[in-house]
Design a protein with these regions (language model features):
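Short aromatic-enriched loop/helix-cap "lid" or pocket-rim segments at secondary-structure transitions
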Residues: 49-54, 132-133, 158-164
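A polyampholytic, Gly/Pro-enriched intrinsically disordered region
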Residues: 61-62, 138-145, 165-177
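Second-shell loop/turn segments in exported
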Residues: 89, 125, 184
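Short, glycine-/small-residue-rich phosphate/pyrophosphate-handling segment
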Residues: 117-160
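Glycine-rich phosphate/pyrophosphate-binding loop and the adjoining helix
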Residues: 157-234
Length: 286
């Protein structure tokens, strides 16, 4: 490979396959334009199942929220130096997925990312602001320069996806409830990632600087202000209960299990109350 060939590292973890497709769509125009892209799929030491088991799904949240991830296998990264790094991730309990956090906490990652321009590519249900704030902190710890963030969210509305996304993760069926829209990101939105990959390609091949203006005016990440309050409230709940559950686990695994069962029942009760009320309020307002 010639020294003048531009190189991009794309790191991702995909449990359902959706994020892998999003990452491929971003990488394709780069590869077609002659940019060398190393795509690295992170592998947990103990694989996460898909579909999830009910218990393991919920038991994952305390460590996820507190950035104490399960270990990953050492990723096979072919080169030591890249012109840019793309980190594609999904959101677990309003935090980056554990394998991504584990990658960013490796000493080898710090050496790799130090001083490098980084783009984050998020595929999630609809709430991502809290996860991205944690991502910013992790990147800053590694000395990386965050220059852009691209976000693709589920196609159906917030109330519906509150039900359809967990149903998909626990059953493996995107349309488990036939009366509700399909879970996941729309095909057109997944394909739209190529538009941003093409912009990075053009910037690299023109030897221009990769900075915060890279995806300016491209609609890379749209903030839904209506969700900010709900996300903050849920984030506080996850954080406090996560800390309590981890402390309980140090005393007794049975105590952690009992408290987690109580919290799950609390969450289900909230869903059964808040989702219908939310739908009713929206209908009345319209």
């Amino acid at each position: 490979m010639g020294n003048d060939v531009k190189k991009v590292l794309l790191v991702y973890y995909s449990q359902t396959g959706q994020l892998a497709e999003l990452a491929r769509n971003f990488a394709e125009p780069l590869q077609q334009g002659g940019v060398h892209v190393d795509c690295v799929n992170l592998e947990p030491q103990e694989p996460y199942p898909f579909p999830w088991s009910f218990w393991r799904f919920f038991n994952t949240f305390p460590e996820t929220v507190h950035l104490k991830p399960a270990p990953i296998l050492p990723p096979a990264i072919p080169a030591n130096d890249y012109d840019a790094v793309v980190i594609a991730y999904t959101v677990w309990f309003l935090s980056p997925a554990q394998p991504i956090t584990a990658f960013l906490q490796r000493e080898e990652t710090r050496r790799l990312l130090n001083g490098k321009p980084v783009v984050t590519l998020i595929g999630c249900r609809n709430m991502w602001l809290g996860a991205q704030e944690k991502m910013k902190s992790l990147l800053a710890h590694n000395g990386a320069k965050l220059i852009g963030n691209i976000v693709k969210i589920d196609a159906c509305n917030s109330a519906a996806s509150f039900i359809t996304t967990p149903a998909w993760l626990l059953s493996g069926d995107k349309q488990y409830f036939r009366a509700l829209p399909s879970a996941g990101i729309a095909d057109g939105e997944l394909a739209d990632a190529a538009r941003f990959g093409a912009k990075m390609r053009d910037t690299l091949l023109q030897n221009k600087t990769l900075d915060e203006t890279l995806f300016q005016n491209m609609g890379a990440a749209k903030v839904n202000e209506k969700l900010i309050f709900s996300e903050k409230a849920a984030g506080r709940s996850f954080f406090l209960w996560g800390r309590l559950l981890m402390a309980a686990g140090r005393v007794s695994p049975l105590l952690r299990r009992a408290l987690l069962c109580f919290y799950i029942l609390f969450l289900l009760a909230m869903i059964l109350v808040l989702v219908p009320v939310s739908v009713l309020v929206k209908k009345l307002l319209h």
